[in-house]
Amino acid sequence: MGFISYFSSFLPDIPWHFWGSVDSLLQGLVGACAVSVLYNLTRVHLYIMCLNDPDKQKEAAQLRAQSLLMDFLHVSLLTLIYSLLGPRVGALVVLEFSLRAVSMVLSVSKGAGSSQLFLLCQFSLGCGVSCSLDYLHEGAPHRTWNLLLAVGLSWLILWQSRRMCRHVGIMYQLHSRERYCGVCLSLLASWHDIPPFLRRALKVAFLVSDLAAVAVINRDFLSTSEAMRFWTPLTICYTLLVIYMQEEQQQNPSEQMVYQTVFVRMGGLLILMMTVGRWADILHIFISLTGEIWCLIHAGVMLRICREQDFADRISSPRKAPISRGSIYTRDGRTLQRETSLEE
């Protein structure tokens, strides 16, 4: 701390609102790095899966084609969006996705696939990380320095994941065949473990984000009655939205439905904020809509692969009907036992 104070003594006096803008930018950068790491790891898993399927070599070639400029644009745009997005709307986005994710996971037994969750949660994950940082560093004496440390660590993880993604796209086929590279051999043996690892990491991230989101929203209320006037319509609105979207996605799991779901969610949140929110929240909802659409466009190829994989899993795993013993009857002097299939 003495070194920081000594170093800060040489800096000119800067207004407090400037440091607030810097902190928002740093929080947005950490959130953008988290989204990019999730994107890179999911891309590695889907690329290896497509390589192992002779019918998906075209998709593997599309995943192999990477652009450094597009990745830089992706991180930069998300950083700008998260830095402009208010913590209140970001917290609402996190809570809405958490409720929707629980509904989707519970409906897996009814035939709905869940592999798209890693891509559908991208923007919500960034909102959760930014919201958590805003809550955890509230009132911290050295908030900017802590956020700089978080940016350094997140950028290091992003660089390593981007490096692995690039290496796998170029050398995985050769190294896995020649048994040459340790990274490629590890992925050859354990690439199936990437989704469970991401699932556990997302559970922890959204658990912390949900707690921070509730705290961020409640800090604006002066009394319990005021909080209840906000939470009651919010809970009803979110519950109805989740039920409606879940039914629509099961009946029509298409690319158009994914974008339609985003507009329905943001439209419902917009109406809610016009009723119990502030005018700044309405502007932040449009910013959130831009971020959601951008994340879906950037992951368009991967979403299509996941959607096809979910459809193939449902086709290849038909429900098995249990066998029960039916009535016993006699024909031609012999006693036969009839077996009947009971539909589930």
From Swiss-Prot:
The chain crosses the membrane at residues 18-38, 75-95, 117-137, 139-159, 201-217, 228-244, 257-277, 282-302. It is a multi-pass membrane protein. Keywords: Membrane, Transmembrane, Transmembrane helix. PANTHER family: TRANSMEMBRANE PROTEIN 82 (PTHR35257:SF1). GO terms for cellular component: membrane. It holds the Pfam family TMEM82. This is Transmembrane protein 82. It comes from Xenopus laevis. It is found in: Membrane. Belongs to the TMEM82 family. The keyword Transit peptide does not apply. The keyword Transmembrane helix applies.
